[in-house]
Each structure stands twice: as structure tokens, then as C-alpha cells.
Design a protein with these regions (language model features):
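Structured nucleic-acid-interacting core domains from mobile-element enzymes and related host factors
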Residues: 17-43, 108-110
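Extended, low-complexity cationic-aromatic segments
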Residues: 40-42, 51, 168
Length: 195
């Protein structure tokens, strides 16, 4: 890091303590009798105090099992929470399309819409509303990309309450309780202490 500070070192120590205390934690894949694709996307708007860039994250589940996830600090500054969430939605739709193509090649894809969960109603409204507003002109390409997938029935957007948002742990720091709840939702277990 080019401008490391003591808070960065504290964050590294926190991560190392977590990893040391959870050596057997990993993903458990279960057969759930279906291969439905669901995904969650989230963004933490203007979270970086240095440059006000946002962090976006997503999780993709196939058959209830976590198969893909990403957390990334974005290279641009968003003007609103809705814009940050909408750009995160665009990233997860791209990933869901890749998963869809993989399942198609494996001949296991069911012809049902893949659900994308987002906790920002404004971002969902932008996707469904074909009218371009001055405040969303700069996300026009993402709008047409998502709108095309909605209209063709490939994806379906749904609202999830913040408490049910699985991608929260990829965009912001969580307390111990919230982290454990989110890890359980992702299918993570501790092989040394199974529940």
C-alpha cells in the first residue's frame, strides 16, 4: 500500500485473528434438488474516507450453494447510493450470465429467470423504468444492459431487506454476530464444530 496507516495494520491484525480462530471454516455444498440461480448484490456508497469511492460486492448461488463472489473497491466515485447499487447490480448480472452460459454448456440449465436480490429500491426502480432522468444519464449503458436481460426474462429483480442481504459482508465491516449470520447464509460451516 502506498499510504498505509495504523488503521490498515489494525484491519490486517483483525483478519489474521479471525483466520487463526477459524481454521476449519469453509463452504459446504449440499444437494438441494434444484439448480436455481440466485444472487445478491450490495454497495457501500462513499465508504472510503480518502477518496469516497464505493465498495461493491456480490454473491451467486446455484442450487442454494455459493459458487461465486466478489468484493471490489470501484475506480469511480458514485453520485448516489442508487447509482452505486445499480453499478453493483450490473456486475452481478454479468456474473450471472456467465454462470448461465456454463450451466447451458453442461445441459443442466432450467429455463427460469435468475433472481437478483438488491436492498436498494431506487436501483431496482431505475432498472424497471425506461425513462432516463438527468441524474442517471451517466449509468445509461448499465441501464440498457440490465433492461435487456429483464425484458428477455433472463433475470428477475427482487428487493431484499438489509437484514437478509447476504452480500453485506463483502462491502462493509460487520460485527461478530452479523458476520456469523451472514457466513451461515453463505453455507459456511466449521468442520471442527459442526452445528
Amino acid at each position: 500500500m502506498h499510504d498505509s496507516r495504523s488503521k490498515h495494520l489494525d484491519a490486517v491484525y483483525r483478519i489474521l485473528r479471525y483466520l487463526k480462530s477459524n481454521p476449519g471454516k469453509g463452504l459446504m455444498f449440499r444437494s438441494n434438488g434444484h439448480l436455481n440461480v440466485e444472487s445478491y448484490c450490495d454497495a457501500d456508497w462513499a465508504s472510503c474516507l480518502d477518496d469516497r469511492r464505493y465498495t461493491s460486492g456480490y454473491c451467486v448461488f446455484v442450487g442454494g450453494n455459493l459458487v461465486s463472489w466478489r468484493s471490489k473497491k470501484q475506480s469511480v466515485v458514485s453520485r448516489s447510493t442508487a447509482e452505486a447499487e445499480y453499478k453493483a447490480m450490473s456486475l452481478v448480472v454479468s456474473e450471472v450470465l456467465w454462470v448461465r452460459n456454463l450451466l447451458t454448456e453442461l445441459n443442466v440449465l432450467r429455463n427460469v429467470p435468475m433472481r437478483v436480490w438488491c436492498d436498494n429500491k431506487s436501483a431496482i426502480n431505475i432498472a424497471y423504468n425506461p425513462v432516463q432522468h438527468d441524474r442517471t444519464k451517466h449509468v445509461e449503458i448499465d441501464h440498457f444492459f440490465i433492461k435487456e436481460k429483464l425484458d428477455s426474462g433472463i433475470i428477475e429483480l427482487s428487493h431484499v431487506n438489509s437484514g437478509g442481504q447476504v452480500a453485506d459482508c463483502l462491502t462493509k465491516s460487520l460485527g461478530v454476530k452479523e458476520c456469523n449470520v451472514t457466513c451461515n447464509k453463505m453455507g459456511m460451516i466449521d468442520i471442527y464444530h459442526p452445528s
